[in-house]
Amino acid sequence: MTERLIDLAESAAYLRIRNRQLVIERHQSRDREGASSPAADRHPSPDDSDSQEDARAETSVPLAEVAALIVAHPQVNCSQPVLAELMQSGGAFIVCDSRSLPVGMMLPLNANVLQSQRLAAQASAPLPLKKQLWKQIVRRKILAQAELLTELRGGDHGLSDLVRTVRSGDPDNREAVAARRYWPVLFDDPNFHRRFDAPDANRLLNYGYAVLRAVMGRAICGAGLHPTLGLHHHHRENPFCLADDLIEPYRPLIDAAVVEHVAAGRGTELDRIGKQTLLEAVLARYSADGEVRTLFDLCARTAVSLVKVLEKQTDRLVYPKNLSEPRP
């Protein structure tokens, strides 16, 4: 089934439901581009045309194909039935601030018939198990960072050796040690650091990570787990701790897209082209472990593997190894 990320940022729009379709009525000038960029749907359709002759353009998308609806334009009107049916279809709803950065997310509540059973197992998971799982996650993240540095910079700058020193719960904070080596080398800038509000490539990283978080949150709910109950992240004001845990090894996919975007001379503005680059990375198909799969499928496999760990069917989380460049 086609997975679509619909980014409503370019023009005002009114949303409604008709015959299990999400209907988008855009209000735009004749020379404005469509609100749902071509990058948001890798199977172009009339709703993705680069220009519209009418001031009002109505398009529709099957609800079952909407993986996430991202709303950034201040004049997008969305009714309760739209949100309810989007949740019932398993989609995510993301709202952005005036800088087009995601600030809120809504996920389906009842996405799995075994939810009560699995939530009980999740809530009662012992601390030693959580620490062991966090060790696996940190190792996979650092290894993915090492692979990206090797591909782009010709060497991993010691990250592969660092993987072997990660202990249960990462008490030595090897994740942070790796980050201090990783970011300056990745962006070829000794002064580059991850900062949420920095007016540089961090803006693109923040947007890409937020969309990735929504994809993982959707997978978590689909597996019958709750995104709030994390393995390592536990801030009381964070409703998506588990999503933040599980996306860690997938972050380098976003990093790679941002580095390529900046290296191509497209700048660091979070504009339409920047978003298109990031949405393409999320919607791409990746080659891993001898198979070609979407990021949605990979995240779903990771979430389901956590269920199997909690139910004592295995002791390993599933993450893809050696992810290759996206395939069209």
Feature names for model-found ranges:
Residues P38-A40, S45-S49:
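N-terminal polybasic/positive-inside topogenic patches
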Residues T2-I6, S11-A13, R18-Q28, E85-Q88, ...:
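Active-site helix-to-loop segments that bind/position phosphate- or nucleotide-bearing substrates
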Residues A12, H27, D50, D54-E58:
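Positively charged, polar, low-complexity stretches
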